[in-house]
């Protein structure tokens, strides 16, 4: 069989409400409207007898040890759940920043499961595929079918696909990796403690651009404030986005440090990206669309 290829797009939390810490397992309960960007890593699978991984690309270095990569972790979980699973050699081209709040590793893992499912004739809702996604990480299930939807629970509860309009946007990462654990520590919730805040807005099944802004503008990312204490440069990145002509909303994604802004049109997004690159040439800046 020829090489199988898929994209692993950046996952953007348009909203991220933390409801509290669950008393049973201590995980943080959340509600989040998730969309996906045009920018992505690329993953290939060459069918073969063994599971292997090769990583290249501009952000390959920070991706960490090969043997601990989420691509192989997801593949091993699936192999453990499916007798006789056909395997192969993965080739990952890393374009997305690592530890950046955009689910790069989770999206890569989900891409690996998609390719193995394709190779083995498995549906994405096949129980072993879902189980492997959940075992690999909280963000992996929503990345299996990378289209806009709501996440709830600790990330394991995935809502139906939503018809969100494609939004002109800019993603900015100031080059500072931010691990999730210190951000949750800064949030400071004890097990069983609830976080006060307005309820998440109701999200309709189909929304044009103005309706999407109407939903997300009054919402929030509850991890933004604690992340600013961990990496204050996030605030600088947000300020640069808000200062650009045509910016309709700027917010942090996930636990940071990537921030995003929704713009009035693609031209405004392109101009904003150019201005921010000129001001901060060492930052990762990408005009894109979110849907």
From Swiss-Prot:
The active site is at 11, 139. It catalyses: 4-CDP-2-C-methyl-D-erythritol + ATP = 4-CDP-2-C-methyl-D-erythritol 2-phosphate + ADP + H(+). GO terms for biological process: isopentenyl diphosphate biosynthetic process, methylerythritol 4-phosphate pathway; terpenoid biosynthetic process. The keyword Electron transport does not apply. GO terms for molecular function: 4-(cytidine 5'-diphospho)-2-C-methyl-D-erythritol kinase activity; ATP binding. Pathway: Isoprenoid biosynthesis; isopentenyl diphosphate biosynthesis via DXP pathway; isopentenyl diphosphate from 1-deoxy-D-xylulose 5-phosphate: step 3/6. Its EC number is 2.7.1.148. Coiled coil: none annotated. ATP binds at residues 97-107. It comes from the Bacteria. Keywords: ATP-binding, Isoprene biosynthesis, Kinase, Nucleotide-binding, Transferase. NCBIfam families: PRK14608.1. Belongs to the GHMP kinase family. IspE subfamily. Catalyzes the phosphorylation of the position 2 hydroxy group of 4-diphosphocytidyl-2C-methyl-D-erythritol. This is 4-diphosphocytidyl-2-C-methyl-D-erythritol kinase. The lineage of its organism: Bacteria, Pseudomonadati, Pseudomonadota, Alphaproteobacteria, Hyphomicrobiales.
